[in-house]
């Protein structure tokens, strides 16, 4: 009995020792797994941090590159604007001393501004004193007509011209009444005479001829006036 009891005690002790070893081994495995999990989480955190820092650095570099490109574009535009301004100033002041030369400067600019259209054959351009004329028409005829109008001071609605035509109509009326003794027929002849003379005078240049003839008699009237009012001793 004693031998069996003694043999059973070592077996129990060895079993307890094995159980304690198993528990210790399990605890060490659990600590190892915890350590591995902690290391993995720390490595993942460091990776996330490095990726976020790299993305922020790339965004900052892109923003800095865009700002530098915009600044370079502004600098390119500013010299172009200054060059255009200098060219415009140089067109008005071609000489080096800053004073406009003869025949240059503002007249050229105004001439360019007065150019209304392109080089089409029917464009409207300024033509000096005769106003706007059509390019392609004869400039000599327009200038001659303008000079005649300035010299004679004639308009198509000139009161003197209408008065002369009215005198012709009244004369025709009186002659017709003298021959026919009928006022109705005389008024008709007078109105027809007045209308026909108005039409011919306005549309066929009779007004210019009448004025030229009358102005030919003006020097004679002035001579008679001077001789008539001359003082005698």
UniProtKB/Swiss-Prot annotation:
Phosphoserine carried by residues: 137
UniProt KW Phosphoprotein keyword: yes
Gly residues bias (residue ranges): 93-104
Biased composition (Low complexity): 50-70
Subcellular location: Membrane
Topological relation to the membrane, as annotated: Multi-pass membrane protein
Taxonomy, superkingdom: Eukaryota
Regions of compositional bias (Polar residues) in chain numbering: 1-14
Chain ranges passing through the membrane: 160-180, 187-207
Any single Pfam family the record assigns to this protein: TMEM40
Stretches for region Disordered: 1-143
Keywords tagged on the record: Acetylation, Membrane, Phosphoprotein, Transmembrane, Transmembrane helix
Biased composition (Basic and acidic residues): 105-114
GO cellular component, one term: membrane
UniProt protein name: Transmembrane protein 40
Species of origin: Homo sapiens (Human)
């Amino acid at each position: 009995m004693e031998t069996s009891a003694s043999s059973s005690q070592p077996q129990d002790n060895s079993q307890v020792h094995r159980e304690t070893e198993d528990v210790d081994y399990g605890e060490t495995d659990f600590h190892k797994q915890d350590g591995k999990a902690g290391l993995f989480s720390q490595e993942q955190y460091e990776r996330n941090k490095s990726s976020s820092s790299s993305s922020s650095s790339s965004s900052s570099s892109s923003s800095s590159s865009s700002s530098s490109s915009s600044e370079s574009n502004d600098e390119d535009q500013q010299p172009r604007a200054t060059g255009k301004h200098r060219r415009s100033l140089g067109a008005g002041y071609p000489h080096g001393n800053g004073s406009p030369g003869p025949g240059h400067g503002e007249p050229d600019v105004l001439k360019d501004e007065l150019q209304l259209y392109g080089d089409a054959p029917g464009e409207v351009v300024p033509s000096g004193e005769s106003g706007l004329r059509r390019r392609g028409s004869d400039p000599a005829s327009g200038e001659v007509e303008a000079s005649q109008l300035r010299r004679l001071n004639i308009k198509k609605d000139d009161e003197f011209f209408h008065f002369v035509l009215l005198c012709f109509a009244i004369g025709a009326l009186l002659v017709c009444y003298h021959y026919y003794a009928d006022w109705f027929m005389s008024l008709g002849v007078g109105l027809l005479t007045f209308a026909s003379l108005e039409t011919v005078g306005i549309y066929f240049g009779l007004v210019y001829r009448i004025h030229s003839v009358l102005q030919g008699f003006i020097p004679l009237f002035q001579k008679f006036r001077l001789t008539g009012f001359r003082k005698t001793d």
